Amino acid sequence: MINSSFILLASTVTSKKVGRITQIIGPVMDVAFPSGNMPNIYNALVVKGKNAAGQDIDVTCEVQQLLGDNKVRAVAMSATDGLMRGMDVIDTGSALSVPVGEVTLGRIFNVLGEPVDNMGPVNATVTSPIHRSAPAFTQLDTKLSIFETGIKVVDLLAPYRRGGKIGLFGGAGVGKTVLIMELINNIAKAHGGVSVFGGVGERTREGNDLYMEMKESKVINEENLGESKVALVYGQMNEPPGARMRVGLTALTMAEYFRDVNKQDVLLFIDNIFRFVQAGSEVSALLGRMPSAVGYQPTLSTEMGGLQERITSTKEGSITSIQAVYVPADDLTDPAPATTFAHLDATTVLSRGLAAKGIYPAVDPLDSTSTMLQPWIVGEEHYETAQGVKKTLQRYKELQDIIAILGLDELSEEDRLLVARARKIERFLSQPFFVAEVFTGSPGKYVSLVETIKGFQMILSGDLDSLPEQAFYLVGNIDEATAKAATLQVENS
């Protein structure tokens, strides 16, 4: 049975309410409707007609304010070029609705749910409004469980919560996209789940690069779209603020269908959550609201909460969200990142230093955090191993200045041993990715949490002190490291 909030497309035609444009200010317009025919807040309005040059116009807007005198103020989801006062505006009678279900996999959509990949129309039988309430408290799954990703450094040191929200921090060129693609690949293989990628206010070139890389690594299967593991929703930097403000909700709505109807585990990527806030700030100013701290919208917390509260685990399935967070001027106290942090369960920080060393994924083991890393959630064994790894790496970090000035020989025997183990740990935190096989030539590895814990315990206990550190670089589990060490020994002898 289909959830009541997902609507089967039918050919019923209702009488439309028609209004007229009275004022246009950039992406915002005022529309007058006949008395008694006012649209509701969040209703979608459509402007169709011809501009002065005789070209067709088709602009969708969303009602934001009821102004009195039978007027509403609406925000456009596409450019308002060519619109004129007096043009007819049709009230669709409902909120923006977008296609949902398997037909969305392997395709790219805009904020309105229209395909923009030149691969023909989407034959959707079910659509859903983008404005929906969060699941009721009675539907929520309150059990704290780890979402295993198969990536050693994440699962051991900053584990993700099933149905949680993770912040992904990292500059350009440190491997954000590859990490995202590997997570999409692993959730499909290990959890039978799908992913939805929401490109919110980022560069068009990056969206195109991601699409091409997904096709190359078979995350999107062009020959058989049904086998694709991801749906893409883009609202790029050059689009009006209305589109950038709502594209996150479009992606979330598609993810909710997979969770609520298909009962799947879903990964929702939002790149970048800051742009969602930024677009809201632009719209707020255009609507004439009084700005709050640092010029942000007064409704910042409400808007963020409305999006984030819909991302959760229910008894049917889960949406686990990974959100790239841009920090303006590296100021963590800025209202936009500060409001985002309140919702995050874990942070994955990518380090340029590790990327420069060739250690991929370049996840910083000391800066990345998770609320799930508690002994009563993950178990004593996991917790103790993770703390041991962090302690060893922290001590190695402290000793690096001494090593740089005086050299390794000046360290005590105990510290030399610790440095050797730390370097093995650092290399063992790297692993070959499935989606990078085409570039590296080495097959990808999915490492279970049990194998991960066992491997790091053996390094910490000193069982593998005799093995060379290069044996631990870009391998899966610890057995591969010992096999690689044996191969290296044969080659060197």
Curated annotation (Swiss-Prot):
Produces ATP from ADP in the presence of a proton gradient across the membrane. The catalytic sites are hosted primarily by the beta subunits. Its main location: plastid. ATP binds at G170, G171, A172, G173, V174, G175, K176, T177. This is ATP synthase subunit beta, chloroplastic. GO terms for molecular function: ATP binding; ATP hydrolysis activity; proton-transporting ATP synthase activity, rotational mechanism. The keyword Ribosomal protein does not apply. PANTHER family: ATP SYNTHASE, ATP SYNTHASE SUBUNIT BETA, MITOCHONDRIAL. GO terms for cellular component: chloroplast thylakoid membrane; mitochondrion; proton-transporting ATP synthase complex. Its EC number is 7.1.2.2. It holds the Pfam family ATP-synt_ab. InterPro entries: AAA+_ATPase, ATP-synt_VA_C, ATP_synth_F1_bsu, ATPase_a/bsu_AS, ATPase_alpha/beta_chains, ATPase_F1/V1/A1_a/bsu_N, ATPase_F1/V1/A1_a/bsu_N_sf, ATPase_F1/V1/A1_a/bsu_nucl-bd. The lineage of its organism: Eukaryota, Viridiplantae, Streptophyta, Coleochaetophyceae, Coleochaetales. Keywords: ATP synthesis, ATP-binding, CF(1), Chloroplast, Hydrogen ion transport, Ion transport, Membrane, Nucleotide-binding, Plastid, Thylakoid, Translocase, Transport. It comes from the Eukaryota. NCBIfam families: atpD (TIGR01039). F-type ATPases have 2 components, CF(1) - the catalytic core - and CF(0) - the membrane proton channel. CF(1) has five subunits: alpha(3), beta(3), gamma(1), delta(1), epsilon(1). CF(0) has four main subunits: a(1), b(1), b'(1) and c(9-12). It comes from Chaetosphaeridium globosum (Charophycean green alga). SUPFAM superfamilies: C-terminal domain of alpha and beta subunits of F1 ATP synthase, N-terminal domain of alpha and beta subunits of F1 ATP synthase, P-loop containing nucleoside triphosphate hydrolases. HAMAP family: ATP_synth_beta_bact (MF_01347). It catalyses: ATP + H2O + 4 H(+)(in) = ADP + phosphate + 5 H(+)(out).
